[in-house]
Design a protein with these regions (language model features):
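A cross-family phosphate/adenosyl-ligand binding-site feature
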Residues: 1-14, 23-117, 124, 128, ...
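Short, acidic/small-residue loops that bind anionic groups at enzyme active sites
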Residues: 37, 43-44, 136-160, 215-221
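Accessory alpha-helical/coil subdomains and C-terminal extensions
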Residues: 112, 120-125, 133-135, 163-184, ...
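Short beta-strand elements at the ligand-binding edges of bilobed clamshell
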Residues: 156-167, 296-302
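Flexible loop/turn connectors
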Residues: 303-317, 321
């Protein structure tokens, strides 16, 4: 396929929760585009930079040049900022009477792109942000998506940047907890991220020596967890480490949510109380939370993010709009957004990682 002519200016934004590696994508996309002779604009906090002249006291749109993206590959967060509350097709606004309503500024967004002479958008985000990008593409905006989720649950890519960093953080935490759990003969319940899939829990639990790993794909029983703890007691192992994905659920039950927010969470606290009641063992919960998203990305995530950023610009060159870049067969390829968002990549319950964990004596609570 021959490159598409007429590209002079592109925009980049980041949406949804942050992930280690976002800045590496921005740097690679910017430098690759500049090599093509294009101008690059950064949109602050998703699409907010197009709707407001100033965002958080800064210009809503920033010109990205080589100096501005120098030395950011190793930095966590995103120099453009992000938001998880920027659904353009249902944006929350405060009405004149003080109540909250919804508006759809998507047509205004597209008009702003035209007015600014932006020829294409590179949208970096998770399933929510990429769904918005897909809908904007269907309305005529030329978009290329870059997948971003530490959960590693998008079916169209073998790996997402930020995942390995999250696993590294969780694994280190599990390792540190072994000594204190053993010293006090406690059960430690460590809640990690993973709303719909258990990739972080599984890989960190296996690497970090967890005794029980609970994931959304395998419903658990508190009684079976108690049996594993009792088995360790009989072997004079008077402590246990349990890692649980935030979206895990008991057999016949539902995931735990934080109040009425609709956000996953709380399973670590609830499970710790149940285990202590059933076993009589002192049980302490620990929620790792946003520490899994923060800090400098590990080298693998930096390199994958750089590859994604460069590939996104190449997709713009080739006119592969309405697509997302993803890792397939070890190479970065373009996948239609509709196809990319149609499948959640779940942990195969009979896969090699689960089989390995079981052979090492790890319980999945089933």
């Amino acid at each position: 396929m021959q490159p598409v002519g007429g590209i002079r200016r592109i925009a980049i934004n980041t949406g949804g929760g942050d992930a280690p590696g976002l800045n590496a994508v921005i740097r690679a996309a910017t430098l690759t585009a500049l090599e093509n002779g294009w101008q690059v604009l950064g949109l602050r906090r998703g699409y907010m930079g197009l709707l407001h002249d100033e965002v958080d006291g800064e210009p809503g749109i920033v010109h990205l040049c080589a100096d501005r993206v120098r030395g950011i590959t190793h930095l966590g967060g995103t120099i453009l900022g992000t938001t998880s509350r920027g659904n353009l097709f249902g944006l929350e606004v405060r009405e004149s009477d003080g109540t909250w309503g919804q508006t759809d500024p998507s047509d205004e967004i597209i008009a702003r792109f035209d007015a600014l002479g932006i020829d294409a958008l590179i949208a970096i985000g998770g399933d929510g942000s990429l769904n918005i990008a897909k809908r904007l593409f269907l309305k005529g905006l030329r978009v290329v998506g870059v997948p971003k989720t530490i959960d590693n649950d998008l079916g169209a890519t073998e790996m997402t940047f930020g995942f390995q960093t999250a696993v590294d953080v969780a694994t280190e935490a599990l390792g540190r907890l072994h000594s204190t759990a053993e010293a006090h003969q406690r059960v430690m319940v460590v809640q990690v991220m993973g709303r719909h899939t258990g990739w972080i829990a599984l890989e960190s639990g296996l690497a970090g020596g967890a005794d029980v790993i609970l994931i959304p794909e395998i419903p658990y029983s508190v009684d079976r967890i108690a049996e594993k703890i009792a088995e360790r007691e009989r072997s004079r192992r008077r402590f246990s480490i349990i890692v649980v994905a935030e979206g895990a659920r008991a057999a016949g039950g539902t995931p735990s949510f934080v109040g009425d927010t609709g956000r996953y969470g709380g399973i670590g606290d609830r499970l710790a109380a149940q285990i202590e009641e059933v076993t009589g063992k002192e049980t302490r919960p620990l929620t790792l939370g946003h520490i899994q998203r923060g800090g400098s990305p590990v080298p693998y995530d930096r390199n994958l993010a750089l590859r994604f950023g460069a590939a996104a610009v190449r997709a713009v060159e080739l006119g592969n709009f309405g697509c997302m870049v993803g890792l397939q067969g070890g190479s970065v390829r373009s996948v239609p957004l509709g196809e990319a968002l149609s499948e959640v990549k779940r942990v195969p319950i009979d896969g090699e990682l689960v089989r390995t964990a079981r052979r090492l004596g790890v319980s999945f609570g089933d």
